Amino acid sequence: AKSREVTIYRDTWGVPHIFGKTDPDAAFGLAYAHSEDDFSTIQDVIIMVKQKSGLFKGKDGAVTDFLMEWLRIYESVDKFYHSHLSPDVKLLMEGYCQGINLFAHENNDEIKLNVFPVEPRDIVMGFVFRTPMFFGLDRELESLFNLTEKPEIQSKSKKENSPTPIGSNGFAVSPKRSENGETMLVINSHQPWDGPTSWYEAHVHSEE
């Protein structure tokens, strides 16, 4: 594997600050730091895209494997991978995968299922599979299955299916009201605290 020039610092709160020589180096560092902090969730996603959920979670996991096959995720990614992704994006994903694979190699005792090494196409398949769920495909499919656990995507509130209009929340703070004299726009992104759709805080720096 290609060597990477990257340094990872942790601040007082444990947030990683990643300094890479190139963009792929920084992506490598981001993946390694993320693996240090939440390797369990990262593995859950990898198990999903490798269509091994049935082996790991039994019946409910097998439903996710079926959906991956039914939606032809692998075929779609295989068909468009080279034509729809730029060389720069592929290099970023290669660096990211190397970071995960290195952490997995160094921490064999934490591996749940033998799904390594991770490859760039695995990352793409994860996005291709999960993105339609954010637009409501999971709600359309939910009635087809009697699951104790929804397929890797956190089920949304039943209220979201209500015909009654439901708004989000956000507010602005004027310079006169803010402590630093700056205008602020505060929103709630509706992200869960944990799981595959939770956010991860990191500061990434590249010399490119």
Predicted feature descriptions by range:
Residues 2-197, 205-207:
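Substrate-recognition/specificity elements adjacent to catalytic centers across diverse enzyme folds
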